[in-house]
Amino acid sequence: MRTPISYYGGKQTMLKHILPLIPSHKIYTEAFCGGAAVLFAKRPSEAEIINDINMELTNFYWCMQVYYSDLKHEINKTLHSRDLHAHAGHINSYPQFFTPVERAWAVWVLCKMSFASMMDGTFGYDFSGTMTKKLRNAKDEFTERLCQRLERMTIENRNALDVIDCYDAPDTFHFVDPPYVNSDCGHYEDTFNEQNMEQLLQLLETVKGKFMLTMFPFDMIDRYARKNGWIIHRIERTISASKSNRRRQEEWMVCNYEERAQASLFQGEYLGE
């Protein structure tokens, strides 16, 4: 199952690396959930908590649960249109003047029509029809099955560190995917800076459960990993920052546990494309 709002900074292209490393757990948290790509791809846990400081994202998930039919109706009649993209941007900038469903629709449109799926990005277009085909597929994939996946979920709109601390337990698995350091990933008002990263690492030193932290290579993380005996799994992925700037970037998956392939067969199975 794929996330309905994949976007810049999400981990869709890393799922084949992430899912096999997920350990056995009963409680699952995504304190920086964004598009929640890992949650939608993995098998359900007994308790699941998603959180994002961006209220428009948490409103989207809430509307999926409560107003699915209304939101689906708005999505079905959406065409690949520069004007609709601009209108969605206006809604996202002034959410207080619009209904929850209109705000949720705007998030979906911006994630699907913006270049690199950045919510503050420019209108994405091409000359091959790929964008319109992807939009049609996204409409077809926006089904009640997605809503059913959210039924057992707790949705939070809090500071990510508070969520990790609140739901931490020996049988918790925290998937921790913050914005890249000194970036807002096109979705947040404030930049995630080095001080924020150090506060996060200091908290992760104390957790009772298991965690996986994703980030590009960063000296501070390497220092904490060496200090605490955390394992760094390194992969390369393509980063698209603009229409003409695509580059290879090393990405780290930092874990406080040993890889356990057999446990991952139950907890981290990829549920289809």
Please describe what each predicted stretch is:
Residues 188-192:
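Short, surface-exposed loop/helix-turn segments at secondary-structure junctions
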